[in-house]
């Protein structure tokens, strides 16, 4: 919905990880595993070397999720999530009607160890709903996770970071995604967040003021802007859970319509506050001019910060070399000059 906002938020997340853990993230994992070729291009320009995405059947086709793939036109390695093995824990662990119930750590690791020849890794991913919402503490979910490392050691199954997987990747097959995909529901698309008119209207009205918000200096407006973009706000407006899909949630609202009304009331107040600072009478051309000025200033700030960093590191900024000045002729005393003149005229 807004490329500039997306990039700004990704940069803030990266900076937060660096400040907390001292590591620069190189593999991207988007909210709800939302991904597309276009998103892949954005994050590649931001310095990421890989991305996690859903191993959706309509994207993979006959291909296996247990391989790495390449983005079609930028240098980005793709790591698909193994949907079945992930959902075995996230959604089936507590399902008494499942034919593999109960799921034990040794059974699960045996499945992992039985991968086909050539399949060197498996991405297993789930959200925190697997711990406490989908699977309560009395289901044994915590004991299951505690036992996994030991069972993995017995079967000589190792754990790897995404960056380690990418470093060992040898597969150059391309994986293309046209429309954005996610890990939600059977469709694996974005319909859980923008699949009905309620969600569409809320999203349109929110991002219609994105340029004005970027010009604001009010910290309260900036903070509320981020909260209003949280995906759960639109997830609660979904009507898909009436059909019994996994979109069913334990949200704070009785219905999607109540979620919509509450959100729009808050958004209306927010839009009024933004309008007080940057009225809608200011046309987009003027706003774009202001944003261009701000972006140029930000670029200059970055350049100055880099120069300061070099100075702190003991490196002087490069200066243009000056051409050495021509030596000045020495002036001789007048008396000697006169004598010399006499000698040259004497015969």
Each PLM stretch: what is its role?
Residues 29-35, 56, 165-166:
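Short, solvent-exposed turn/loop segments enriched in Gly/Ser/Thr/Pro and often Arg
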Residues 67, 72-76, 80, 95-96, ...:
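Active-site and substrate-binding clefts of carbohydrate-active enzymes
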Residues 38-48, 63-66, 169-178:
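Substrate-binding cleft/loops of secretory-pathway carbohydrate-active enzymes
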Residues 313-347:
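Intrinsically disordered, polybasic Lys/Arg-rich low-complexity tracts
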Residues 3-11, 23, 44-83:
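Acidic, His- and aromatic-enriched active-site or binding-groove loops in soluble protein domains
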Residues 1-6, 23-31, 89-104, 132-139:
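The substrate-binding groove and active-site-proximal loops of carbohydrate-active enzymes
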Residues 3-32, 111-125:
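CE4/NodB-like, metal-dependent polysaccharide N-deacetylase domain
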Residues 7-14, 40, 109-112, 145-149, ...:
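Generic structural signal for well-ordered alpha-helices
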């Amino acid at each position: 919905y807004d490329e500039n906002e997306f990039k700004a938020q990704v940069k803030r997340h990266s900076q937060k990880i660096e400040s907390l853990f001292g590591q620069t993230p190189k593999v991207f994992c988007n909210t709800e595993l939302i991904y597309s070729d276009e998103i892949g291009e954005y994050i590649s320009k931001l310095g990421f070397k890989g991305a996690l995405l859903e191993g959706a059947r309509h994207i993979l086709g006959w291909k296996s999720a247990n391989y790495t793939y390449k983005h079609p036109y930028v240098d980005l390695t793709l790591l698909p999530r193994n949907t079945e093995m992930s959902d075995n824990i996230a959604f089936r662990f507590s399902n008494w009607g499942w034919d593999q119930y109960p799921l034990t750590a040794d059974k699960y690791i045996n499945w992992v160890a039985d991968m086909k020849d050539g399949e060197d890794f498996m991405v297993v991913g789930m959200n925190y709903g697997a711990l406490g919402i989908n699977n309560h503490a009395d289901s044994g979910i915590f004991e299951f996770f505690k036992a996994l490392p030991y069972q993995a050691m017995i079967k000589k199954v190792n754990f790897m970071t995404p960056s380690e997987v990418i470093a060992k990747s040898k597969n150059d097959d391309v994986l293309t995604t046209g429309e954005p995909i996610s890990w939600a529901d059977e469709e694996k698309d974005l319909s859980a967040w923008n699949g009905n008119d309620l969600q569409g209207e809320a999203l349109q009205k929110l991002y219609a003021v994105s340029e004005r918000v970027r010009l604001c200096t009010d910290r309260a407006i900036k903070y509320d802007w981020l909260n209003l973009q949280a995906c759960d706000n639109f997830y609660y407006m979904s009507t898909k859970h009436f059909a019994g899909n996994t979109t069913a949630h334990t949200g704070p609202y009785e219905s999607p319509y109540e979620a919509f009304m509450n959100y729009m009331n808050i958004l209306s107040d927010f839009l009024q506050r933004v309008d007080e600072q940057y009225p809608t009478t200011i046309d987009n051309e003027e706003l774009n001019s202001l944003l261009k000025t701000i972006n140029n200033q930000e670029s200059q700030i970055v350049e100055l910060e880099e120069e300061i960093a070099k100075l702190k590191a003991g490196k002087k900024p490069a200066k243009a070399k000056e051409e050495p000045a021509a030596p000045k002729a020495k002036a001789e005393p007048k008396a000697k000059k006169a004598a010399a003149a006499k000698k040259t005229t004497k015969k």
